Amino acid sequence: MNRIYACPVADVPEGEALRIDTSPVIALFNVGGEFYAINDRCSHGNASMSEGYLEDDATVECPLHAASFCLKTGKALCLPATDPLSTYPVHVEGGDIFIDLPEAQP
């Protein structure tokens, strides 16, 4: 895994999301003080998940076609999406957030 620095904890208030411009682009969410990182692109359409509608049950709804995804597993919960989103481990160290990304393939 390749651990990257994402941002200070204060940059992602509870109930909010932040787009992290890395490769791949990540959507970082704060749900009740727990942080989740998923691929920022909806698996159904070309929409930014960081602009989606965050629910208290750690799900996010795509802003384009209302597909819903579990932030914990990336699983698509309803149509029109059927493919899951990639999820990434998140670590809080002090006041900073780090995300583990897979190693780049040669």
Swiss-Prot record:
Needed cofactors: [2Fe-2S] cluster
Chain residues that bind [2Fe-2S] cluster: 42, 44, 62, 65
Keyword list, A-Z: 2Fe-2S, Aromatic hydrocarbons catabolism, Electron transport, Iron, Iron-sulfur, Metal-binding, Transport
Domain of life: Bacteria
GO molecular-function term, one example from the UniProt record: metal ion binding
Pfam families: Rieske (PF00355)
One annotated GO biological process: 3-phenylpropionate catabolic process
Residues of the Rieske domain: 4-99
Textual note on the cofactor: Binds 1 [2Fe-2S] cluster per subunit.
InterPro entries associated with the record: HcaC, Rieske_2Fe-2S, Rieske_2Fe-2S_sf, Ring-hydroxylating_fd
Keyword Iron set for record: yes
Associated pathway: Aromatic compound metabolism; 3-phenylpropanoate degradation
Assembly: This dioxygenase system consists of four proteins: the two subunits of the hydroxylase component (HcaE and HcaF), a ferredoxin (HcaC) and a ferredoxin reductase (HcaD).
Family from the record: Belongs to the bacterial ring-hydroxylating dioxygenase ferredoxin component family.
Role, per record: Part of the multicomponent 3-phenylpropionate dioxygenase, that converts 3-phenylpropionic acid (PP) and cinnamic acid (CI) into 3-phenylpropionate-dihydrodiol (PP-dihydrodiol) and cinnamic acid-dihydrodiol (CI-dihydrodiol), respectively. This protein seems to be a 2Fe-2S ferredoxin.
Name the UniProt record assigns to this protein: 3-phenylpropionate/cinnamic acid dioxygenase ferredoxin subunit
